[in-house]
Amino acid sequence: MKERNISIKSKVEIQELFKKGRFIRIEGINVFYEFTCLAISRILVTFPRIFKGAVKRNRVRRIFKECFRKQFALLKDRYVDFIFVVYPQKADVNYHEVETILKNIVVYIMKRNM
């Protein structure tokens, strides 16, 4: 069975999330999030135009998506759409840093929305 796609791809959904979503800034990363009625949490990793180098952008994107995929259990049956805007100072981020950042974000969101 094919795993569901965890990416947000619709331009309308992305614009709506930027407008209506809640906002957190953590360590050079802006996070927009909104609870959703879908049966899956989704993610979009994007970068400002000043972030040059496709190889670095794609590496950061892969790391974020993999960490997010492994952190599904922390959301405890709550489904959230996330947009991560990653700035150039986080270009050399490693897997364990991203894992820690995502755990902190999920814990913060769950505390805030209990």
Curated annotation (Swiss-Prot):
Gene3D superfamilies: 3.30.230.10. Consists of a catalytic RNA component (M1 or rnpB) and a protein subunit. RNaseP catalyzes the removal of the 5'-leader sequence from pre-tRNA to produce the mature 5'-terminus. It can also cleave other RNA substrates such as 4.5S RNA. The protein component plays an auxiliary but essential role in vivo by binding to the 5'-leader sequence and broadening the substrate specificity of the ribozyme. The keyword Hydrolase applies. GO terms for molecular function: ribonuclease P activity; tRNA binding. It is an enzyme of class 3 (hydrolase). It catalyses: Endonucleolytic cleavage of RNA, removing 5'-extranucleotides from tRNA precursor. Transmembrane segments: none annotated. This is Ribonuclease P protein component. GO terms for biological process: tRNA 5'-leader removal. It comes from Borrelia hermsii (strain HS1 / DAH). InterPro entries: Ribosomal_Su5_D2-typ_SF, Ribsml_uS5_D2-typ_fold_subgr, RNase_P. Belongs to the RnpA family. Its EC number is 3.1.26.5. Keywords: Endonuclease, Hydrolase, Nuclease, RNA-binding, tRNA processing. HAMAP family: RNase_P.
